[in-house]
Every structure is written in structure tokens, then in C-alpha cells.
């Protein structure tokens, strides 16, 4: 279903990530280059279950879930860069530093998730993540994921 070798659709994302509804937060990968970068999309719908309580009358996409979406994007880039893992291995979200939230994300927005590979050592990879909406930075952070059984 891929239109080119740098695009991943839902079926391919589901093969890489263990996350499922309602916690899969990457809709499509629009471009990537192994060991360098990945761009992905998360379309924000009012139908997301957390909008019932966050916040009634003023729905805001939770910041921690923006971070989780970027972490899932780093996992996809790590899997695509390192190749298929042993069936007992996963990439775990290991750390986050310097997280900043710059603008709210609301229903109807489309988040562009950008993650850039910084370095990898002994199964721990470091990335910089930036999420934008309409060209404006909504969130940025440094993240690490660890390859473990």
C-alpha cells in the first residue's frame, strides 16, 4: 500500500508498533530516512475519547499525548533504521528532556510530527522531536528510546 519507499500507511505502522486504539497516535508516515529523520501525521478528531474530560467545553489535546505521539514516531524511525527486531524485543520510551509546549492543539488540527536522530549507543537512541500545527511549533522535546526484551 506504500506509494513510495519513504511513506508508511496504517497497516505498515501497525506491523512496527505494539500500540492499538485508543493509544495509536501516528496516522501516517509521510517521509523518513534511516538514521536521520521521520515526518508523520496525527489528525486530531473531536471523537478522541479523552476530549470528554480534557476539557469539557474547551477541548485541548493533552500535552503528554503529544509527547507520546512523538515517542511513537521515534519508535517507528528506530525500527525502520535498525531493521526487524527479535519478536521479544521492543523500543521503550526511556527519557524526555527539555519538553516545551508552545500552543494548544485542538480538534480539527493536524499535527506534523518531526523526529530527528541524534545518536545511538548500546541500544539507546536519542532523538529531537518537534510537533507543528499550521506551521507553528506546538511542542518540542529531546527523547530517548531503549531497545530491550
UniProtKB/Swiss-Prot annotation:
<dbReference type="GO" id="GO:0009245">
    <property type="term" value="P:lipid A biosynthetic process"/>
</dbReference>
<protein>
    <recommendedName>
        <fullName>3-hydroxyacyl-[acyl-carrier-protein] dehydratase FabZ</fullName>
        <ecNumber>4.2.1.59</ecNumber>
    </recommendedName>
</protein>
<dbReference type="Pfam" id="PF07977">
    <property type="entry name" value="FabA"/>
</dbReference>
<dbReference type="GO" id="GO:0016020">
    <property type="term" value="C:membrane"/>
</dbReference>
<keyword id="KW-0456">Lyase</keyword>
<dbReference type="InterPro" id="IPR013114">
    <property type="entry name" value="FabA_FabZ"/>
</dbReference>
<dbReference type="InterPro" id="IPR029069">
    <property type="entry name" value="HotDog_dom_sf"/>
</dbReference>
<dbReference type="InterPro" id="IPR010084">
    <property type="entry name" value="FabZ"/>
</dbReference>
<comment type="similarity">
    <text>Belongs to the thioester dehydratase family. FabZ subfamily.</text>
</comment>
<comment type="function">
    <text>Involved in unsaturated fatty acids biosynthesis. Catalyzes the dehydration of short chain beta-hydroxyacyl-ACPs and long chain saturated and unsaturated beta-hydroxyacyl-ACPs.</text>
</comment>
<keyword id="KW-0441">Lipid A biosynthesis</keyword>
<keyword id="KW-0443">Lipid metabolism</keyword>
<feature type="active site">
    <location>
        <position position="54"/>
    </location>
</feature>
<dbReference type="GO" id="GO:0019171">
    <property type="term" value="F:(3R)-hydroxyacyl-[acyl-carrier-protein] dehydratase activity"/>
</dbReference>
<dbReference type="GO" id="GO:0006633">
    <property type="term" value="P:fatty acid biosynthetic process"/>
</dbReference>
<keyword id="KW-0963">Cytoplasm</keyword>
<dbReference type="GO" id="GO:0005737">
    <property type="term" value="C:cytoplasm"/>
</dbReference>
<keyword id="KW-0444">Lipid biosynthesis</keyword>
Amino acid at each position: 500500500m506504500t506509494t513510495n519507499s519513504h511513506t508508511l500507511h496504517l497497516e505498515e505502522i501497525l506491523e512496527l508498533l505494539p500500540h492499538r486504539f485508543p493509544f495509536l497516535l501516528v496516522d501516517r508516515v509521510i517521509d523518513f530516512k534511516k538514521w536521520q529523520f521521520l515526518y508523520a501525521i496525527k489528525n486530531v478528531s473531536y471523537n478522541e475519547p479523552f476530549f470528554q474530560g480534557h476539557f469539557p467545553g474547551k477541548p485541548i489535546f493533552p500535552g503528554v499525548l503529544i509527547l507520546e505521539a512523538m515517542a511513537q514516531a521515534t519508535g517507528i524511525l528506530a525500527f525502520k533504521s535498525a531493521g526487524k527486531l527479535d519478536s521479544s524485543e521492543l523500543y521503550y520510551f526511556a527519557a524526555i528532556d527539555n519538553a516545551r509546549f508552545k500552543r494548544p492543539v485542538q480538534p480539527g488540527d493536524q499535527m506534523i510530527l518531526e523526529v530527528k536522530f541524534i545518536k545511538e549507543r548500546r541500544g539507546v537512541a536519542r532523538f529531537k522531536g518537534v510537533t507543528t500545527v499550521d506551521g507553528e511549533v506546538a511542542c518540542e522535546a529531546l527523547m530517548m528510546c531503549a531497545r530491550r526484551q
